[in-house]
Amino acid sequence: MSAFVRVVPRISRSSVLTRSLRLQLRCYASYPEHTIIGMPALSPTMTQGNLAAWTKKEGDQLSPGEVIAEIETDKAQMDFEFQEDGYLAKILVPEGTKDIPVNKPIAVYVEDKADVPAFKDFKLEDSGSDSKTSTKAQPAEPQAEKKQEAPAEETKTSAPEAKKSDVAAPQGRIFASPLAKTIALEKGISLKDVHGTGPRGRITKADIESYLEKSSKQSSQTSGAAAATPAAATSSTTAGSAPSPSSTASYEDVPISTMRSIIGERLLQSTQGIPSYIVSSKISISKLLKLRQSLNATANDKYKLSINDLLVKAITVAAKRVPDANAYWLPNENVIRKFKNVDVSVAVATPTGLLTPIVKNCEAKGLSQISNEIKELVKRARINKLAPEEFQGGTICISNMGMNNAVNMFTSIINPPQSTILAIATVERVAVEDAAAENGFSFDNQVTITGTFDHRTIDGAKGAEFMKELKTVIENPLEMLL
């Protein structure tokens, strides 16, 4: 009996699923009616991602809005919320799998729980060639159903095979804190190998660190044994492997995460493709510090301004005065796009790498609102809970290393297609000439700010003008109120 396959386009009710391929296939001679769940596109630029964890197991009921998996994109770990009623019949891709292309089948769901056992041995190849190769968005208009008779030689493969599936299904949800998941992904650790000591066996940061410490000890013991038998170690060397270090060398190979790979690609693109130049300026922040102290003294716990909050506002004012610094270079559109709004990207160090959450429309916001937004964004950035639109974009960037008193000057790499990034060093007390002082000098609090500019968008004279305006605003902070 030949198998007939009906492919029915289904339009999702979710913004996530509208960007992922979901094809309903019914094989009359094999499997009950079911739906293939594709790898979702969780951001406009996402082409692939890592499946960090399944939060549902095979046979579990699915309800609209429930999280069924955690997906790691290039710069964030995000929840995949499903928007249909049904049951998870088969997991096609195990958790921990990396670099899964968008739309690739990752699971199967059915509407009737009684159909779940039929998919015990369902495999990725059984999902049908159309579901793996089609990349175009499905049309919204209903299409006439088409039946296509399969060739006789393919009839055998339409029925479920008796042998066990190569994809092992997870044994249940693994509970872990967001920080623990982040560190595990960065270090290439499977959470299944870690014993959780938190409530309900929840894996914590301490559990991950304990696992790493034990692994390190075992590794050192192994290398010690190998060093004791150099003849055996020599014979085990294989051709084509990485150059072997000396017998006394100690090192650790850390897998390159998706995030580190993307950061590396973008920064390499920036350094090789942008004709950048730098302009540095020593700027007095004594008045800025006094303003901050005065405002915080009367805040009544409504806000607590940092130096960085004030600098973000100062950069905003300078960008409005010199629009060339607040622009994109867009060669594909043959334009330089100058923005009227100022969206400041704030560089934040996280356990997995650098993120740049965005404070949008800073020109229309006061200091307290900017401060509160930065604190909230930084908090979520450090546990990889930012939405893509919260860190993708921005019109100008600030990178602040002022908390490290060893950094008195540094430069940053432009984040394309932006044209400007400001590098903020630490505050230094500097002796300056002061005729009114008893000894002829006094001490001033100064900071070195270095701007890196894209010469295609903003000429050197304009870059210098921007730094002059920034210096003026910082040294006369009341101008931020104008």
UniProtKB/Swiss-Prot annotation:
Q: Upper taxonomic classification of the species?
A: Eukaryota, Fungi, Dikarya, Ascomycota, Saccharomycotina
Query: Which positions fall inside the Peripheral subunit-binding (PSBD) domain?
Result: 175-212
The record's section on Pfam families has: 2-oxoacid_dh (PF00198), Biotin_lipoyl (PF00364), E3_binding (PF02817)
**Subunit relationships:** Eukaryotic pyruvate dehydrogenase (PDH) complexes are organized as a core consisting of the oligomeric dihydrolipoamide acetyl-transferase (E2), around which are arranged multiple copies of pyruvate dehydrogenase (E1), dihydrolipoamide dehydrogenase (E3) and protein X (E3BP) bound by non-covalent bonds.
What this chain does, per the entry, is described as: The pyruvate dehydrogenase complex catalyzes the overall conversion of pyruvate to acetyl-CoA and CO(2).
Q: Which InterPro entries match?
A: 2-oxoA_DH_lipoyl-BS, 2-oxoacid_DH_actylTfrase, Biotin_lipoyl, CAT-like_dom_sf, E2/Pdx1, E3-bd_dom_sf, LAT1, PSBD
Organism the protein comes from = Saccharomyces cerevisiae (strain ATCC 204508 / S288c) (Baker's yeast)
Question: In which domain of life is the source organism classified?
Answer: Eukaryota
What is the protein name stated in its UniProt record? Dihydrolipoyllysine-residue acetyltransferase component of pyruvate dehydrogenase complex, mitochondrial
Name where it's found: Mitochondrion matrix
